[in-house]
């Protein structure tokens, strides 16, 4: 199979915001306890954080981490997680039928985020709480001192404010599964008033308002329009969430699911622009795709997990090589929309539908999906370019006619590099690929990294953590994308 990839330096999509390489840690399963935080672990540092996990997070290249939820946040009292640990209450976590010990809270999280070099993105509870609690949390985190909650923070040993810039106004508030779920009118009014107050406390804060939980919600579209009609002047981003799975075992269709993400982004962008015009606003609403991933492997086993325990093994998907190809396609799609998608969070980060897995008290390792994210975060910087691909296509079930090759090119003027990310979806044909970049002169190919495996169901485990591992190909004049492979091709100019 032949493929041609075209891009032009003079026609960028836009700058790639580093926050598109974000992730998510929720108080759910073993994400926090036994993942991020495990004081008795051999690698634990002075704060109880697992050093082996922090090294993997840094290697992954995560730039921002959303916290503490997720569904969890809609029943969370942030005050439970501050001050002396021995005084913190144990609470029922109704979102995940677990016990929350509150041994990790906002102060510990921001300390951990600083250690891994990621910006924190805090969510406030708009399920059981509202304006007052959000105001107080913002004051505790970001006000210098001389007030009740800023001085409370200082009394806890944190003299300087945390300076948390990014905040989520609740989570999936349209969902019937959500604690304190709301109609679009109810949520829109509450989110608008909360946003006003939070920005009065800290004018530098940047706020994300909840979009629909997914495109199958009966109010999808109407929800976005209604919520934005109340909040457009007060918030900076609208959230999108989407997960994909292969329950039917149809690999060809599964590999095309990024087409659904593409249409989702286009639809929500159009709704945002419609509200913008109706309000005669000069502000563009950006998107925060703050939950995206493959999620389906753990659905059945989660039904067997004992309820009302601390850190139960929930949502522990073990990812295949096939899943890594899908994650690669989803990353490419996000980058192709970098003019609107300014924040994105791979959900989640540790143990829970995550690229990083741990044994409580034991080993840690990188799952298959770790590597496409790591490559994009490391190499796809600067500007994304309008990228066109000419290649064969196939019928992908509900996603329709789908090109075999999915690709995006990025250019970084600061170091004069060009990166091409590409997935070959074909089951049996390599793609001999020609890349043409206009407006940049001659290109020199510097590197070709590939992630491939003969077994689509291959996984990495604690005992075999390198079964699916990227490798460098020998450089040659021809660029060949192997059948069912993830590729990173680096050029300089």
Write out the residue ranges for each language-model feature.
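Acidic/histidine-rich catalytic cores and adjacent linkers
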Residues: 304-305
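Active-site His/acidic residue clusters
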Residues: 241-257
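Non-catalytic accessory regions flanking glycosidase/transglycosidase catalytic cores in CAZymes
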Residues: 1-223, 228-237, 261-262, 266-300, ...
């Amino acid at each position: 199979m032949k493929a041609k990839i075209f891009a032009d330096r003079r026609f960028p999509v836009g700058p790639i915001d580093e926050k598109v390489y974000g992730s998510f840690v929720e108080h759910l399963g073993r994400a926090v306890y036994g993942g991020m935080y495990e004081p008795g672990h051999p690698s634990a540092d002075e704060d109880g954080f697992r050093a082996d996990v922090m090294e993997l997070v840094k290697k992954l290249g995560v730039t921002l981490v959303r916290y503490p939820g997720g569904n969890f946040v809609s029943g969370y009292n942030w005050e439970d997680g501050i001050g002396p640990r021995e005084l913190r209450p144990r609470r029922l976590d109704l979102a995940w039928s677990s016990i929350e010990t509150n041994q990790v809270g906002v102060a510990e999280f921001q300390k951990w985020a600083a250690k891994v070099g990621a910006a924190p993105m805090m969510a406030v509870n708009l399920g059981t709480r509202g304006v007052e609690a959000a105001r107080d949390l913002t004051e505790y985190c970001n006000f210098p001192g001389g007030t009740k909650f800023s001085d409370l923070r200082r009394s806890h040993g944190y003299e300087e404010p945390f300076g948390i810039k990014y905040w989520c106004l609740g989570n999936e508030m349209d969902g019937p599964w959500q604690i304190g779920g709301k109609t679009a009118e109810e949520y829109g009014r509450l989110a608008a008033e909360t946003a006003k107050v939070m920005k009065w406390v800290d004018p530098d804060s940047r706020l994300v308002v909840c979009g629909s939980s997914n495109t199958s919600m009966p109010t999808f579209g109407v929800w976005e329009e209604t919520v934005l009609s109340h909040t457009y002047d007060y918030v900076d981003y609208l959230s999108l969430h989407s997960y994909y799975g292969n329950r039917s075992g149809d690999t060809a269709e599964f590999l095309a699911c990024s087409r659904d993400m593409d249409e989702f982004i286009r639809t929500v962008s159009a709704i945002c622009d419609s509200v913008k015009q109706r309000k005669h606003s000069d502000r563009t609403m950006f998107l925060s795709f703050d939950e995206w991933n493959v999620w389906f492997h753990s659905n059945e086993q989660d039904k067997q997990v004992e309820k009302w325990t601390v850190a139960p093994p929930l949502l522990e998907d073990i990812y295949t090589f096939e899943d890594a190809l899908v994650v690669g396609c989803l990353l490419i799609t996000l980058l192709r929309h970098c003019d609107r998608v300014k924040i994105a969070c791979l959900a989640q980060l540790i143990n829970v539908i995550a690229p990083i897995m741990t044994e409580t008290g034991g080993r840690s390792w990188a799952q298959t999906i770790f590597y496409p994210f790591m490559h994009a975060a490391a190499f796809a910087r600067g500007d994304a370019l309008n990228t066109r691909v000419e290649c064969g296509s196939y019928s992908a079930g509900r996603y329709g006619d789908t090109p075999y090759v999915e690709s995006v090119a990025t250019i970084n003027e600061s170091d004069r590099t060009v990166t091409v990310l590409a997935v070959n979806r074909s089951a049996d044909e390599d793609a001999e690929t020609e890349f043409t970049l206009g407006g940049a002169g001659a290109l020199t190919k510097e590197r070709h990294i590939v992630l491939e495996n003969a077994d689509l169901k291959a996984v990495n485990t604690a005992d075999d953590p390198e079964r699916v591992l990227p490798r460098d190909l020998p450089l040659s004049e021809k660029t060949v994308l192997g059948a069912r492979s993830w590729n990173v091709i680096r050029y300089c100019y």
